[in-house]
């Protein structure tokens, strides 16, 4: 299996804090994969999450793409951003369909590692807690393993292209999300979040290698 993406792609490993790694990337003129390293525990809120109260003791930043909160911990998630310019053959005007191809890449990568995965091709299914917690809902192009969400995808578009932000879970604690966001009733939120998502039974390195190999 090749160690990098196809020649049509540029692989970059930016450095910085989680907040810095969420900064605008500027005009998108080519296909790029950004592999981001998480150095400190950080709760990342979606662009529409305003006035959210978060428990003390953790860094909090806001991303420019939508969806609910994502908890990033070192070693707990494989965070990959994918940049696609407008007009590329991978570009899809229909936002509801625009992430399907990316979900299929993740599913193919997981298949290489012996994990059966399903790409959600239906509409957004936020459930009760999806507006607050990314992994409590299911959106188009996101990936489920044994009925639980394991890869989340959000996107931000501008005139130049799309930035897809992917988080593949290597660890998951619904209890911690309930505590950080103060969700109530606690028992109901705990049960929902613990069953809604689950970590992948793979290591970050092989998963990244397989993901890069399956990029079109």
Where are these regions (language model features)?
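Gly/Ser/Thr-rich beta-alpha loop segments that engage phosphate groups in nucleotides
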Residues: 68-69, 154
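Short, conserved charged micro-motifs
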Residues: 54-55, 90-95, 176-178, 206
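Short glycine/proline-enriched loop/turn "hinge" motifs that connect secondary-structure elements
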Residues: 69-75, 159
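Aromatic/basic-lined ligand-recognition segments
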Residues: 133-155
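Active-site loop/lid in soluble adenylation, ligation, and acyl-transfer enzymes
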Residues: 1-56, 61-63, 69, 83, ...
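Long, positively charged amphipathic alpha-helical accessory segments at protein N-termini or as interdomain linkers
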Residues: 103-129, 156-216
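Internal, conserved structured core segments that host functional sites
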Residues: 79-134, 139-140
């Amino acid at each position: 299996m090749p160690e990098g993406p196809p020649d049509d792609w540029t692989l970059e490993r930016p450095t910085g804090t989680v907040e810095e790694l969420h900064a605008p990337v500027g005009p998108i003129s080519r296909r790029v994969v950004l592999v981001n390293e998480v150095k400190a525990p950080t709760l990342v809120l979606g662009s529409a999450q305003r006035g959210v109260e978060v428990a003390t003791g953790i860094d909090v930043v806001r991303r420019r793409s939508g969806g609910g909160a994502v908890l990033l911990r070192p070693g707990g998630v494989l965070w990959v951003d994918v940049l696609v310019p407008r007009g590329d053959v991978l570009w899809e005007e229909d936002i509801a369909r625009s992430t399907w191809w990316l979900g299929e890449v993740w599913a193919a990568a997981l298949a290489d590692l012996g994990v059966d995965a399903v790409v959600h091709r239906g509409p957004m299914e936020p459930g009760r807690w999806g507006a607050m917690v990314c992994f409590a809902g299911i959106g188009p192009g996101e990936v489920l393993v044994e009925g639980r969400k394991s890869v989340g995808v959000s996107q931000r578009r501008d005139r130049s292209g799309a930035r897809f932000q992917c988080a593949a879970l290597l660890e998951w604690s619904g209890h911690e999300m309930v505590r950080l966001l103060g969700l109530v009733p606690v028992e109901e939120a705990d049960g929902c979040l613990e069953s809604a998502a689950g970590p992948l039974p793979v290591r970050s390195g092989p998963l990244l290698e397989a993901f890069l190999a399956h990029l079109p």
